[in-house]
Design a protein with these regions (language model features):
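C-terminal accessory segments of proteins
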Residues: 1-568
Length: 568
């Protein structure tokens, strides 16, 4: 029977409502209670299995990143995990990963028909604001079979240490036995003495669970809406254009014209930009949620939505999958993937552009060396279909007809109304009377990942002529490794870009160009406590952000520049 993946938001809401009520349960509520208890029981049992068990949570989580395998154990030119990011296999590899995890859940007695729910990240409340993270993902305890147990959906305690031994990485992602995964605003960096000291201080400041849950929900909501609140010294609070919000990115990625562009950030950056909104890949909002849940450093911020020193496990590829929320997040990502397929008539076939840079491995993965060509026939290691064969992307195109009793469907979700193609959307920033949605120019920031350790965010600002304010017009979260600077292939190949298309309406709103006045554009990289603006700042802006400037790296952020249209 085809398994159905339901909204965890709905299941969690009905479950806790039922537990707090003395009234008889209706059918939907009773089913929700039974379904959620099966999900919790299955994951709880997987977490209790010894690490060497093929179906243990430790083993399954370890497929993604740590513990590293093969050449990637020490060689920074290789990725020591099996996951695919920034290439065309990102959606399909993670689709297979979820199936493997779900299959393991189904080995637990009494859970043979369980399906993994999805955290519906785009669900809005009656005020059109993002819903909080489902309560079952943030409670410390869960009552199962008459006993209160450590909630296996909230955190996981390592049953075996993780040794991060990549050359030049300073053991940053090493974790001891019994390490407990954490989320924003806490830190889980304990691999070396400096990180342990910083983490001890950070977590002492955020020791109260309920308060941390409030801060986590606020932070995720801020990312989803595109609201950013930073130090008011010359940079005023501003709502970011919808295309830079995570809600907007999830919406706009459904307009990507090809699977190649839709699938990953590398191909997204190579796509032509001649319309608004610009092409967005599924991987882009996916990255942002990782950073929102795991945390990243916001220097000088007064708002609790962005707290310095927050470095939870979801913020890094190496350890993200050990946080149980990872799988519910990726289940939503797969829901959006399937929605894109339905929207574009691609439920039975997906095509990869073999000439696209996203169809080539940038660093070695598994036993595939750098520069390996990727296709729908590439093995999705380590997932075995038979004793001799691996699953391939072409096996997973139609989710309802995957062989071997692996077919599944999605229950109702917040983006179901986008299953049909829509007309082009007008620019969210328009002139006072008439909006011009034609792209007039594109601005670009290029950042070398090797210069910045770990994950970071590229940000772009515009300063209207004659004004003291900076308006943020674009941002791109980059989910990255700590040890990229030791990777020869990464240094040579892995520049990342933020591209911001500017329509006539946006330029009119900013008050320049067509009026003969000059708009100033500035770039910034925000990561691990530093706000690195571009070189040659005007004194006014430099003074306004002086508190946040610790180092300026002109080689890391190139001055925002015009880009010719169309981009290729």
């Amino acid at each position: 029977m085809t398994r159905v993946r339901q909204s965890l938001n709905r299941l969690s809401y009905l479950y806790y409502k039922a537990k707090e009520s003395d009234e008889a349960l209706d059918t939907e509520s009773q089913n929700a209670v039974e379904t959620l208890e099966k999900v919790v029981k299955a994951i709880y049992e997987l977490q209790k299995k010894p690490p060497g068990d093929a179906n243990s949570f430790f083993n399954l989580a370890g497929y993604h990143g740590e513990p590293f395998q093969g050449q990637g154990t020490t060689d920074p030119n290789w990725w020591g995990g099996y996951c695919h990011h920034a290439n065309v296999l990102f959606p399909t590899w993670h689709r297979m990963y979820l199936l493997r995890y779900e299959d393991a859940m189904r080995t637990v007695p009494g859970c043979e028909d369980v399906a993994l729910p999805f955290w519906d990240e785009c669900e809005l409340d009656q005020d059109k604001k993002p819903m909080p993270i489902p309560e079952v993902l943030t409670r410390e305890k869960f009552r199962l079979d008459g006993q209160d147990i450590p909630n296996p959906l909230f955190s996981y305690k390592l049953q075996k240490e993780l040794k991060h031994e990549v050359d030049g990485a300073a053991h940053r992602y090493s974790k001891p036995l019994d390490y407990q995964t954490v989320r924003y605003p806490r830190s889980g960096l304990v691999g070396n003495a400096w990180d342990r000291l910083a983490t001890r201080s950070q977590n002492a400041d955020y020791a109260h669970h309920d308060w941390c849950t409030i801060l986590l929900n606020r932070n995720v909501s801020s990312w989803l809406q595109g609201n950013i609140k930073i130090t008011p010294d010359g940079i005023k609070e501003t709502r970011i254009a919808d295309t830079t919000s995570v809600l907007g990115r999830y919406n706009y990625c459904l307009d990507a014209s090809t699977y190649t562009i839709f699938s990953n950030v590398t191909s997204q950056k190579n796509a032509p930009i001649d319309i608004f909104p610009s092409p967005t890949s599924l991987e882009s909002p996916h990255n942002a949620i990782h950073l929102a849940v795991g945390g990243f450093y916001q220097p000088g911020a007064y708002n609790a939505n962005e707290i310095p020193g927050a470095n939870g496990d979801m913020g890094d590829n190496e350890t993200a999958s050990f946080d149980p929320i990872f799988f519910f997040h990726h289940c939503f990502v797969d829901y959006v993937f399937w929605l894109w397929q339905r929207r574009h008539g691609s439920t039975t076939k997906l095509e990869i552009d073999p000439n696209d840079p996203g169809a080539v491995l940038q660093e070695g993965v598994g036993n595939m060396p750098p520069k390996t060509k990727l296709s729908m026939d590439t093995d999705l290691q380590p997932f075995k279909k038979t004793a001799q064969l691996y699953w391939k992307s072409k096996d997973l195109v139609n989710i309802e007809e995957i062989e071997g009793n692996h077919g599944y469907k999605y229950g109702p979700g917040s983006l179901d109304h986008l299953a049909s193609p829509r007309k082009p959307v007008a620019s969210p920033i328009r002139g006072p009377e008439k909006g011009d949605d034609k792209v007039k120019k594109v601005k670009k920031i290029t950042v070398n990942r090797a210069v910045h350790r770990g994950s970071f965010v590229i940000r772009m600002f515009a300063k209207p002529p004659g004004k003291r304010e900076l308006i943020e017009i674009g941002r791109e979260p980059v989910l990255s490794r700590w040890d990229v600077e030791e990777c020869d292939n990464c240094r040579d190949k892995l520049d990342v870009h933020l591209l911001v298309p500017l329509t006539g309406g946006m330029l009119d709103y900013l008050g320049g160009d067509d009026r003969g006045e000059k708009i100033t554009y500035l770039g910034a990289v925000q990561a691990y406590g530093q706000m690195d603006f571009t070189a040659n700042l005007q004194d006014m802006v430099h003074d306004a952000a002086a508190e946040n400037l610790q180092d300026v790296h002109p080689s890391a952020v190139k001055l925002v520049q015009d880009v010719a249209l169309p981009l290729r």
